[in-house]
């Protein structure tokens, strides 16, 4: 442990620089993408039923995204990385496991 009189250099890391980028408690890009899809549905169909359906679907998806972000705020990035590495790391064990 460093003593109070030591010459260690300390740097402040601001909380905003290390926090994940969330909007309404969910991943920002996914919330905006689902909002865009709901708005497109509402303005293309132009009925009250489409408006209610679009808002309901958006609220359900945002709830699911908030649950996902509560488990891991970076889950979208982890999943995209998992998909890109899927060819290199198989889900099966190696044939040399028994040795």
Curated annotation (Swiss-Prot):
Subcellular location as annotated: Cell membrane
InterPro entries in the cross-refs: Conjugal_tfr_TrbD (IPR016704), T4SS_VirB3/TrbD/AvhB (IPR007792)
Transmembrane segments: 40-60
Domain of life, per lineage: Bacteria
Membrane association type: Single-pass membrane protein
Gene Ontology cellular-component annotations: plasma membrane
This protein's UniProt keywords: Cell membrane, Conjugation, Membrane, Plasmid, Transmembrane, Transmembrane helix
Pfam families: VirB3
Coiled-coil annotated spans: none
Family: Belongs to the TrbD family.
Full protein name: Conjugal transfer protein TrbD
Taxonomy of the source species: Bacteria, Pseudomonadati, Pseudomonadota, Alphaproteobacteria, Hyphomicrobiales
Gene: trbD
